[in-house]
Design a protein with these regions (language model features):
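Positively charged n-region of N-terminal signal peptides that target proteins for export
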Residues: 1-5
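Short glycine-rich loop/turn motifs that provide flexible caps or phosphate-binding loops at active sites
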Residues: 7, 344, 460
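Bacterial N-terminal signal peptides
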Residues: 7-19
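Hydrophobic alpha-helical elements and their junctions with loops/disorder across both membrane
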Residues: 14-15, 300, 354
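Beta-strand-rich, non-transmembrane domain signature
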Residues: 23-265, 289, 338-341, 349-520
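Secondary-structure boundary elements
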Residues: 267-342
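Short, contiguous, pocket-lining structural segments
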Residues: 302, 306, 346-350, 459
Length: 521
């Protein structure tokens, strides 16, 4: 099943912002007054409610790789709808691995006055959660009544990281915020948003012995590099960027919006070796796991069948539910023993369970970083949101398995995941590669029907639907998601596009968990 891109996964973000305190109202700098006036009004941006007048991010990176980010935005209200949209500001963070501080909030009124908002009035609350319950939090700050022509200035400070699959080996008061791949920094910076941007800048300072490699994608972004004593200063900016337009079936914004991808890591094999080393200890098995593997594979000789049996057991028996295990959650693969006992986890834990069981069965297996929903660029920055499994074969090739997307799907690799980029974590190091593309025929739905039209105009007949690939999963899910007593009703709802009033009189269907043959009903 496709999971929302945040889900349990491999994204690493380093952020940090400046300290400051809300104080008495003061006149804004002339440059801000001029920027707000020059930004224009609703006539300048037809159909838009807000415009991002200025977006500046400054990042200072330590030797450890810890990034300190200072972020400042200036957003102008163009319509009453925009005023309502800005009424409450939300700031997300994970207290286990990062922090955020709201330093300055000012409202620049249309009449030229400035109103300061006390950041300490923000309310700290648990963030809404669905399927992943790791203790994320948010700060909500309500603003005074806004009017068309007003502009909101916000400055924040944030540091830390958000990443899955890593072991926690850090100590000390600030060590919790140091990225797990210690000594390295990477980021993906988008230069387009859901609202138009007048000016966006991103400035990065790194130690001189930690040069950053980067590339610009999907549009013009100007950049520069300067030497500054013991530091390297990188800067990128974009001007007059239109709002990102979403359409039905639009690819992920990171595939279309102008962006800079940057990293101090040399190449993907280096990232692969690190990923292998930090995760290798979690794949140990205990007696209970060994007995279950023996039970499942008793009498089975074919290697492909063994892999499929273990894949589907993990897919069906380990529920997708991220329960916090305490310190280190969100960036640590759960040990296989823990997942087997809990019978739940997110994609990283489900993949780890399959790696553990396949190793018990004698297969050489590794965890894999991948990105479901968008491409991964050649620059070795973390661009992952999902974890899967690789089985190394005798000829050195790999067979890819994804237990998270396998529930009620016969295929051992979802046909939704064609051309998906991935990096396998091995001791020798692997490069970035991609899954092959899948032809439409691999997900074909075959429909055989025999029907007659009676004198009243009703159509009576029999229909046989046989699905492969994506269509196989569609049929199985329609059956599995319905109570056993209502499967005829579920099939009737599946057939509703054929015409109103479809009635299923009799049904013979595949058992949804029978993966020995294509789904048929």
């Amino acid at each position: 099943m496709m999971r929302p891109i945040p889900a349990g996964l491999l994204i690493l973000v380093f952020l940090v912002f400046p300290s400051g305190a809300g104080g008495a109202a003061e006149a804004p700098p002339d440059s801000l007054v001029a920027r707000i006036a020059a930004a224009g009004d609703s006539a300048s941006f037809p159909g838009e409610d807000l415009v991002l007048v200025l977006d500046v991010t400054r990042v200072d990176v330590e030797e450890s790789g810890l990034g300190h980010v200072r972020h400042r935005t200036l957003t102008k209200v163009l319509t009453e709808a925009g005023a309502r949209a800005l009424a409450t500001r939300r700031f997300d963070y994970d207290p286990a691995s990062n922090l955020i501080r709201i330093d300055t909030v000012r409202i620049h009124r249309e009449d030229g006055t400035t109103e300061a908002v006390d950041p300490s009035t923000a309310i700290d609350l648990p963030a809404p959660a669905h399927l992943i319950y790791w203790g994320a939090r948010m700060k909500l700050l309500s603003l005074p009544r806004l009017r068309v022509g007003d502009a909101v200035e916000i400055a924040t400070y944030k540091k830390g990281f958000q990443i899955a699959y890593l072991a926690d080996e850090t100590e000390g008061p600030d060590e919790r915020y140091v990225p797990p791949m210690r000594g390295h920094f990477y980021d993906v910076v988008l230069f387009q948003d859901d609202l138009p941007i007048v000016e966006k800048r991103y400035r990065l300072r790194v130690p001189r012995d930690k040069p950053v490699q980067y590339s610009v994608y999907n549009g013009p972004v100007s950049g520069s590099l300067r030497f500054a004593g013991d530091s390297l200063l990188y800067a990128w900016h974009a001007l007059d960027v239109p709002a990102f337009e979403r359409e039905p079936r639009t690819p992920d914004r990171t595939d279309l919006a102008p962006k800079v991808v940057l990293a101090t890591v040399e190449d993907w094999p280096e990232k692969s070796r690190w990923f292998f080393e930090v995760n290798e200890p979690v794949f140990e098995a205990d007696g209970a796991i060994r007995r279950k593997v023996e039970e499942l594979l008793r009498g089975v000789e074919d290697e492909e069948e063994k892999m499929a049996i273990l894949l589907h057991w993990v897919a069906q028996e380990i529920r997708y539910s991220g329960i916090s295990m305490g310190e280190g959650e969100g960036y640590t693969l759960h040990p296989g023993i823990m997942t087997f006992h809990d019978r739940c986890g997110v994609c990283k834990d489900i993949a780890g369970m399959l790696v553990t069981m396949l190793r018990v069965a004698g297969f050489t297996t590794y965890p894999v970083m991948t990105m479901a929903g968008s491409r991964v660029e050649r620059i070795p920055a973390d661009q992952f949101n999902h974890c899967v499994v690789a089985v190394e074969r005798e000829d050195g090739s790999f067979t890819m398995l994804d237990p998270t997307w396998a529930p009620f799907n016969r295929a051992t690799w979802s046909r939704w995941e064609g051309e998906q980029h991935y990096v396998i974590g091995t001791a020798d190091g692997e490069d970035l590669t991609a899954i092959r593309s899948f032809a439409p025929e691999e997900s074909r739905m075959r429909i055989d029907g025999h029907a007659r039209l009676d004198a009243a105009g009703d159509l009576h007949g029999t229909m046989t639907l046989t699905g492969k690939g994506i269509s196989d999963g569609r049929l199985r899910s329609a059956l599995a998601d319905a109570p056993a007593w209502d499967r005829t009703g579920a099939v009737a709802r599946l057939l509703e596009p054929l015409g109103a009033g479809v009635e299923v009189l009799d049904l013979e269907a595949v058992e949804p968990r029978d993966f020995s043959r294509d789904a048929q009903l």
